[in-house]
Amino acid sequence: MSVRESLIKHLSSILRASKGTLLVLLCDQNGLSVAKIGRKTEIELDPNQITSLAAAAFSASEENWEDLDIKEQIISFSFFEMVCLITIRIDKTLLTIVHDYNEEWPLDADSLASSMYYLKQKLNEFFGTGQISESEIEEFSNKVRSAIYLFGMGTEVPFESYKPEGYNGENLLPAMSEVLDSIQNPIFIRYGLVGPSGLTLDAKEVSGENLPIGIEAFSANASVTFQKMKEESKDSSLGELLCYVAVSGEDAENFYGLITCPCGKLRFSDDEGESNIQEVSFIGLFSLDYGGIPVIGESRNIIYSILEIIGGDNITERFIKTVNDITSLKYE
C-alpha cells in the first residue's frame, strides 16, 4: 500500500464517522495538499481554497498565542454559512474536516481521537523520525478528544437581550459598554468590541489573570486574526465567515480559546460631518473549563444586543441563527 493510500484509509474512517462530514483533507503547513477524500454534496467545495484556509486558521492566531504565552494551538473551528472547517495540527501537517453542522453537531470526540492516534502514528512513520513513543501519541489523541468534547459541552445560555433601557441614541458607545457588562456567566477572561483596524471600541478584563499582553494589544491581535481569515475566505463558495474559534494549551486542564465574530456595522459622523460606516467585531479569550456552548451562547447574546443598538446586519444575523441552530441540535 502506498503512502497516499495508507493515509486515505485513515481519512476515510473520519469521513464515515459522521453523515455531516463532507470532505477530509491533509495538507502541509503552507496549504499544499497531501491527501483527501470526500462524498457527494450539493455544496461546492474547492479543496485548494480549503487547504489555504486550513493554513490560515493556524497562522492567523499564532501571534496572539505567542504574546499570551499559551502554546500550542491544537484545533480551530471556522464557521461559515454552509459548513464548519475543523482544523487540527498533526506534527508538520494540518488535517481539515469539512463538516455540515446543520446535519450533525457536535462531532464524536472518541471516534475522532481514535483516528488521530493512527494518523499521527502513520505520519511519523512516513515523514518523521519514527522514534515517537506510544505515550506521546496517546497524549496527542487525548488532547484532541478533550478539545472536541469540551467545545461541544456546557450549559446552554438562554437567548436574551442585554440592551439597556433609555440609552442616548446620539452616543451609542456607553450603551454598548453596558451590554458588555451584562453577561450572565463569568466565562471570559477578557472580551470586547474592535474595529477592522484593531482599534478597541470597548473591552473588559474579567478574571484578573496576570497575562503578558495588555487588553488593547490582545484586542488588536484578535481583530487582525479575524480579518486575515475573512480575506482568505473572500468569495468562497462556503459563504461568509461567521465565527472563528481557536483552542490552545498544554493539556485539558489548561485549554484556552480565542473567539472572533462579526458584530454589525457602526454608523457615525466624523468631525467634518461626513458619514462613515465601520465594521465591528466581537473578540474574546476564555478558558474551556465551562465548555464551548456557554461561550458561543454568551457571544450570541452580546452580539444580538449590540445589533439592537446599532442596527441590523445580515452576516451578523446569520451568526446568531447558526448559534441557535447548533445549540438546538446539541440539546435535541
Positions of PLM-derived features:
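Acidic, low-complexity cytosolic segments
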Residues: 2-21, 29-188, 197-332
